[in-house]
């Protein structure tokens, strides 16, 4: 037999052939035994690769037979390597003619030629299949988009969600849209850009060609998973700038997504059509540039003018520089929204009633607060800065002992730690001149605290000895901790360390909450750590705690990608929706000449109420931002006021929830009334439609007064974190306000505005 004549190379080839055959059998058996496993892209490539290895080894062995049967003689290694090269050539549609022609061996020669021919045909076929599999996804995506474009022309969908680029943010948001939208009246389209130079677009040879043809496998998987269309642009949107855009310039067509432009062009045929465009990359600069370019696209502008509600979502920090694109779009048919993930993180804290500062102080029978609120913020980046602002505003309570002649804020103290504080503090000082803060200490020194300081900034690392000293000094009375560094592992490590110290040294460890910023919770590892230590904390006082419990302990995780990028937060914009509803209820307590809804205010300050050729002033912009931020804060702070009233009732030994419900019913049904412009309430005999009883009214004057004081203190704190200071008159451009004074210095009419906010907060939701 020829294999004995070949020697060890033949036996090696035979072993490789057997291994390849076994691999094929394993793959086929898996598919047969589990029919539910789909033949996805990965499995297709594995099947092709296994088959190609099998054919290559078969060709290797066949060529060994062919060479050994010829007239020449070969060294063993020469025979092995030449056969291997000849076998590889079969996948490139090549047959070694010299070897093929010189095959001898009598009756075996036709058989060897036939085997080589069959293997060559099969190998060539696999090469074609491999090429097709690599480009099939892109071809199918294009055909799918073409068919959808034709369908959209005839039967356009009401809502369109377009994502420019595929990253973690766009994938999470698209998935949430798919899961939460019950009506099948929308389409999701991913516009993916060409591969960058680093990813091989500018490479040479076969690598460059294959990169262009195959694109990213993850791109196609993401589109398929979300039942989305995929349009791959021929050029990058970031290569354009607003200065390049001329009148009637079709940006979508210029970057090679003309089919998307056709879909947008036909959307006006559907009633209440909406088009949402998302630019959510990690680069603020690129996002702002892309949003500016898209806003000038002739197709998008035309659709907006024809009644399609058009919104551009741009991921960037919500600051004065980046808000320019929102201001420029005001008055146009296209709405531009800045999506600040750090801001949304902290808004989540406000949304969760259990995390509001009112839960970590002592509330007395009159609704005042008798204990200090002591906080620690680790990391003074975007999230840390917003957390400081949140705590300063939402921990503004009327101190026990306050009277209408002298209302004071309950003690508040916040230590902020960051190893780059010498750089970060400047912005904080500049933007919030009203906040009393100490100068930043040199690196390595502990800032000396003074009694009249509310916020103290420390310039050292959270792993330093200085931080340990600070923590040991503060842990006894610490109420609230926010850990918001850029390192998730460091964040949870610090949280566990603080919790362990609180168990050892805190006077009231049950009054401590540790908020931990976690960017990615997909693997669940940090959740396991948090649940473990929360369970240990609960079991310390509750011996019946079960091992599988996930108790609500001191450590709370927040700010992960999936919880931020949701339909509710981004598209539905829950913050603005709740603020609008709150403003409507607030306006109902004013005479008709005072009423101005959300949209009317926009039109008055920035929109159609102005001459289209005139620019809004700085005062217009600042007034709009200030009032809208107050509407949002009022909506969120309502929970604090309700909890203050409930805790006040509970302090007097009553059923807090029941008494709070009686109070809300009395306010809603007119059992408790107040004249416009006045602060005193009239307690009427409860009517038949109210559940309130006369005994409920006995302690209410002091509670309602405390709530109004608290609202004024919150209002002052919110304006201070916005950057406002006291002035003889209100000047939006100079950021001065004449109401930034103590409660007792206000006129009764101005005080009644705070009472209005309290009344709206107490009203039952219809």
Show which residues each predicted segment covers.
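Short interaction-hotspot residues at assembly and binding interfaces
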Residues: 605, 609, 728-741
């Amino acid at each position: 037999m020829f294999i004995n004549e070949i020697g060890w190379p033949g036996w090696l080839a035979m072993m490789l052939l057997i291994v390849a055959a076994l691999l094929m059998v394993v793959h086929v058996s898996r598919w047969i035994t589990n029919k539910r496993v789909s033949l996805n892209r990965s499995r297709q490539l594995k099947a092709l690769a296994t088959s190609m290895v099998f054919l290559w080894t078969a060709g290797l062995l066949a060529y060994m037979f062919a060479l050994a049967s010829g007239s020449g003689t070969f060294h063993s290694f020469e025979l092995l390597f030449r056969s291997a090269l000849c076998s590889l050539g079969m996948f490139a549609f090549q047959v070694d003619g010299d070897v093929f022609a010189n095959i001898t061996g009598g009756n075996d020669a036709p058989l060897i030629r036939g085997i080589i021919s069959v293997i060559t045909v099969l190998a060539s076929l696999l090469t074609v299949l491999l090429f097709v599999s690599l480009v099939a996804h892109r071809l199918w995506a294009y055909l799918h988009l073409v068919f959808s474009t034709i369908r959209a022309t005839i039967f356009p969908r009401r809502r369109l969600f377009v994502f420019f680029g595929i990253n973690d943010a766009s994938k999470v948001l698209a998935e949430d849209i798919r899961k939460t939208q019950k009506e099948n009246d929308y389409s999701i389209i991913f516009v993916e850009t060409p591969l960058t130079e680093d990813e091989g677009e500018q490479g040479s040879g076969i690598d460059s060609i294959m990169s262009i043809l195959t694109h990213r496998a993850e791109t196609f998987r993401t589109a398929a998973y979300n039942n989305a269309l995929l349009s791959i642009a021929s050029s990058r949107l970031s290569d354009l700038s607003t200065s390049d855009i001329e009148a009637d310039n079709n940006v979508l067509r210029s970057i090679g997504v003309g089919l998307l432009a056709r879909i947008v062009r036909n959307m006006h045929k559907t009633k209440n059509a909406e088009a949402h465009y998302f630019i959510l990359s990690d680069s603020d600069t690129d996002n702002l540039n892309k949003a500016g370019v898209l806003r000038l696209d002739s197709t998008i502008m035309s659709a907006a003018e024809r009644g399609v509600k058009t919104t551009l979502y741009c991921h960037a920090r919500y600051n004065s520089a980046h808000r320019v694109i929102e201001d420029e779009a005001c008055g146009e048919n296209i709405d531009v929204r800045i999506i600040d993930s750090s801001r949304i993180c902290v808004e989540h804290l406000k949304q969760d009633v259990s995390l509001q500062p009112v839960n970590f102080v002592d509330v007395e029978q009159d609704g005042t607060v008798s204990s200090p609120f002591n906080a620690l913020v680790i990391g003074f980046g975007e999230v840390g800065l917003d957390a400081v602002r949140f705590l300063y505003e939402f921990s503004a309570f009327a101190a026990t002992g306050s009277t209408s002649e002298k209302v004071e804020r309950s003690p508040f103290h916040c230590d902020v730690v960051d190893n780059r504080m010498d750089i970060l503090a400047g912005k904080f000082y500049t933007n919030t001149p009203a906040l009393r803060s100490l100068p930043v200490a040199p690196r390595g020194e502990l800032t000396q605290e003074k009694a009249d300081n509310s916020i103290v900034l420390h310039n050292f690392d959270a792993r330093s000895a200085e931080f340990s000293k600070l923590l040991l000094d503060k842990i006894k009375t610490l109420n609230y901790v926010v850990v918001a560094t850029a390192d998730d592992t460091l964040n949870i490590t610090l949280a566990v360390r603080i919790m362990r110290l609180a168990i050892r040294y805190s006077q009231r460890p049950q009054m401590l909450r540790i908020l931990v910023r976690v960017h990615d919770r997909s693997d669940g590892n940090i959740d396991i750590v948090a649940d473990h230590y929360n369970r240990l904390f609960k079991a310390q006082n509750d011996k019946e705690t079960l091992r599988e419990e996930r108790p609500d302990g001191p450590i709370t995780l927040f700010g992960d990608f999936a919880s931020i990028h949701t339909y509710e937060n981004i598209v539905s914009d829950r913050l603005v929706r709740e603020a609008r509803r709150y403003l409507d209820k607030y306006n109902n307590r004013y005479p008709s000449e005072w009423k101005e809804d959300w949209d009317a205010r926009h039109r008055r300050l920035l929109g159609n109420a102005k001459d289209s050729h005139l620019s809004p002033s700085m005062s217009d912009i600042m007034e709009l931002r200030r009032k809208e931020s107050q509407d949002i804060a009022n909506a969120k702070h309502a929970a604090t006021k309700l909890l203050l009233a409930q805790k006040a009732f509970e302090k007097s030994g009553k059923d807090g929830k029941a008494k709070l419900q009686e109070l809300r019913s009395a306010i809603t049904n007119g059992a408790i009334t107040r004249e416009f412009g006045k602060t005193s309430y009239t307690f009427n005999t409860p009517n038949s439609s109210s559940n309130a009883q006369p005994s409920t009214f006995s302690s209410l004057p002091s509670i309602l007064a405390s709530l109004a004081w608290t609202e004024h203190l919150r209002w002052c704190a919110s304006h201070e974190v916005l950057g406002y200071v006291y002035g003889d008159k209100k000047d939006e451009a100079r950021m001065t306000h004449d109401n930034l004074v103590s409660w007792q210095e206000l006129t009764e009419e101005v005080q009644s505005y705070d009472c209005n906010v309290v009344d709206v907060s107490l009203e039952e939701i219809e």
